Amino acid sequence: MAETLKIVIPMAGWGTRMRPHTYSKPKPLVSVAGKSTLEHLLDMFASVPSPQNTEYVFIVGPYLGEGQIPAFVTEKYPNMKAHFVVQREMKGQSHALYLAREYLHGPMVMCFSDTLMDADFSLLADERADCVAWVMPVPDPRRFGVAEVGADGWVTRFIEKPQTLENNLVVVGCYYFKRAESLLAAIDEQMARGVTLKNEFFLTDAISIMIEQGARTRTEAIRTWLDTGTIDATLDTNRTLLEKAGTHTSTQVDRYTGTQV
């Protein structure tokens, strides 16, 4: 991957489902298994094809995130190429990306800040699809969004909160776009059409517009998906990560400098 990869992490929400923990800090800085959720999330990207040719875009909220997230990232990751964008109005996921458009060029990964998974991002080095959505089969998908895949293996559409159990490929909240510009064009179209749900612009609607326009979109299955969006889910994730940490140790590498630590 010759072009700079942009990793975009929207995190502007109020964190109401994590109160009282989010009264004094934004949700990504809440501790899970000895580290903040944000640190676990950034660890997840260690397998990107060219770590030293990667830039991060953090979309933060105006309350606590605007001050605390940049300070935390600058202190913890001094070698990271990072940009920070403030989303002052909660108008949805697509709106957040629209605000960050000046930084979004070429290949891009977007992952929500409460999504932890076991993805291998090294596959992006040779990826030919226009869009990849990471998915995980679950017994009951009705609380989530799912990807509908055609006989040819390409995604035909996304469905939010399906009414049946027939399609259980749940979209976990992480996507790759071969060209960020294509997504931004779809977001422009989404906003022009006024495609919203509860007055918010959802990313899956923008991707559906990309598919309408011919974008080849596929899924990539994962085996582990950990959520930190609610207190109960965070407690489960904390237990899972602690159990995993107790089974093995590994050498860590600073992916921004290549130095073992």
Predicted regions located by residue number:
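Conserved core of the sugar-phosphate nucleotidyltransferase
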Residues: 116-194
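Conserved N-terminal catalytic core of the sugar/cofactor nucleotidyltransferase
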Residues: 1-12, 17, 23, 30-31, ...
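Left-handed beta-helix
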Residues: 1-4, 151-154, 181-182, 188-261
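A structural signal for short hydrophobic beta-strand segments in well-ordered beta-sheet cores
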Residues: 29, 147-149, 219
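A general structural signal for well-ordered alpha-helical segments in protein cores
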Residues: 38, 66, 70, 97, ...
